[in-house]
Each structure stands twice: as C-alpha cells, then as structure tokens.
A protein has these predicted regions:
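Alpha/beta hydrolase fold serine-hydrolase catalytic domain that processes acyl esters and thioesters
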Residues: 1-6, 47, 113, 130-281
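A glycine/proline-hinged amphipathic helix-loop "lid/cap" segment
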Residues: 1-44, 194, 281
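Short beta-strand element of the alpha/beta-hydrolase
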Residues: 46-55
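Catalytic nucleophile-loop/oxyanion-hole region of alpha/beta-hydrolase
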Residues: 62, 68-69, 81-115, 259-262
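Conserved catalytic-core motifs of eukaryotic protein kinase domains, centered on the activation segment
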Residues: 61-63, 92-93, 161, 226
Length: 281
C-alpha cells in the first residue's frame, strides 16, 4: 500500500507534455474518461500504431516517454495513439484492458484493422499482447490488429521454472526486481478476485488468431524468464512470431538508447515496424 500511495502522489504531479511538430496535428480525445494523445501526420496515411507505454500498471506515462512516441511516429511515418489508461493504483487491471480495447475500437473508424499495429513496452507489452486473449474472451466482434510488438512484456510468474530463471536474472537486472513480479498479482487485482487469469499470467492466454508478433527482450532482465513460456504459447496457437534477444541488454533497451547496442535496438524496432506496415525505409 505504501508503494501504491507513493505512485499516486507521483502520478498526481505528472502532466501531459505540450508537444509541437509542424508535420503533425496533435490533439487529445477522451475514452472512458481517460486522455488519449493523437499524433496524426498532416500528410494523410492509412497506417497507425497503438502505442502502450508501461509503468508496472501503477505509473502514468512520463513526458519523456511521450516525446519518444512522437519520435517513433516521425521515424516510422505512422499515426500514433497513446492512451493514458487506468492504473492499478485505483482500479483492477480489467479497467485498463477495457479502455485500451475501446481506444482500439475507436481507431477502427479511421483505419483498417490490418493497418493497425500495437506496440507495448514493459506492462504496456502485456497490454499489447493481452489484446488477443481479450478479443477471444467474448469480444470476437472486434478484428485482430495487423501486428504486435511486445518489448519486455511484463507478466507474473506462473511456474517454479519461471521463478528459478527469474531469480538468476535478478542478479543482473537493474530495473525490475524479481520480488515485484510476486507481489504484482495482488496489485493488478486491486481487491477484485474476478480479474481473468490471463490478465495476470498472460502466458496462459488464448492466442487463437493472434497476428504476427515480435518479442524483444534484454538477456539480462528478470522478465526474460517468461520468454520460454510465451514461446510455448505462440507455438501452441500456431502464431507467426519472432523472439529477439539483446545480449547483455537491459529491460526495454530499445526505448532507452543510452548506449550503442541500445540505439541499435531502437533502429531495429523502427525498421521492423515499417516493414510490417509496408513502408519503405
């Protein structure tokens, strides 16, 4: 509770930055009472990305992350939607899933499903991947997006093997303590025992009809412990996927290009996204 109260105070101080770029129409809309930032190219494009910024389900997107979203939009040529989804400081995780689904549905009025990608970092990676089991969970009137990229997707530990791997990686990880992934389940439930299992242990989700998916992990992060379980899930459901691992790299390294290898991760992320949207580099 002390952790959550600390995050509530930090989130209360957080502000949506005032972005300016002559190539974009930048605006906001509201979905379920939450702001969604729209970064729309003035030169019309039919390609878009739903950009889900992580924060352990308890921290709102920081101004620096929003500026990275604009850089991503600029470098990929995609229109980008950034939802400030409900956090588990105040709601169970079901609320975030519902709001993100509603945001995606709103995008379908402007873009074809196959022209929409979903990129998520950390807990945002969980939410990006989680759109698939959510659609399969009685929302099958919604078409799947065209492509998913999950960077260091967060999920809770489901097996002893995952926990053993995570404890080993904990010795190297500078960002996500293994112990947090033990306590995260209660944070995500927020007192609601009806939160579906797949929202907490995403590796158990139903990935039927999942679009092509790219995973990107750093080899030295605790969340990499769950990569084999995600691979097994992808194989079980016949998903076209790729697993990219940055050797010696840290949590969400492509979006924190603080060294040469991490900068290469950012460039790779941009190249892959453009390729999947059929945009020439």
């Amino acid at each position: 509770e002390e952790l959550l109260e600390n995050r509530r105070r930090q989130n209360a101080k957080n502000r949506i930055p005032d972005l300016k770029d002559d190539a974009f129409d930048i605006s906001r809309m509201e979905i379920m009472g939450c702001p969604v930032l729209k970064l729309i190219h003035k030169k019309r494009t039919e390609q878009a990305d739903l950009f889900l910024i992580g924060g352990g389900m308890i921290s709102a997107p920081r101004p620096g992350s929003i500026k990275k979203a604009l850089q991503f939009a600029r470098e990929t040529g995609l229109d980008v939607y950034v939802p400030y989804y409900p956090l588990c400081t105040g709601y169970p995780l079901t609320r975030a899933y519902e709001m993100i689904h509603a945001t995606y549905r709103s995008m379908l009025f402007e873009y074809k499903a196959e022209n929409i990608s979903v990129l998520g970092t950390s807990s945002g990676g969980n939410l990006a991947l989680g759109m698939v089991p959510y659609i399969n969970d009685n929302h099958d009137d919604t078409p799947m997006p065209g492509y998913i990229m999950a960077i260091s997707p967060g999920t809770c530990v489901a097996t002893d093997a995952e926990w053993q791997r995570m404890q080993e990686l904990d010795k190297k990880d500078v960002a996500i303590p293994a112990q947090y992934m033990k306590t995260a389940a209660e944070i995500m439930r927020h007192g609601d025992d009806s939160v579906p299992e797949y929202m907490i242990w995403l590796q158990k989700g139903d990935f039927t009809n999942c679009p092509k998916t790219t995973f990107i992990y750093g080899s030295d992060e605790t969340l990499y412990a769950c990569a084999p379980s995600f691979e097994a899930a992808m194989q079980k459901y016949g998903v076209d996927y790729e697993m990219i691992v940055g050797e010696g790299m840290f949590h969400c390294y492509p979006v924190f290009p603080v060294c040469k290898e991490a900068k290469e991760g950012w460039d790779l992320m941009i190249r892959l996204m453009k390729k999947e949207h059929g945009i020439k580099s």
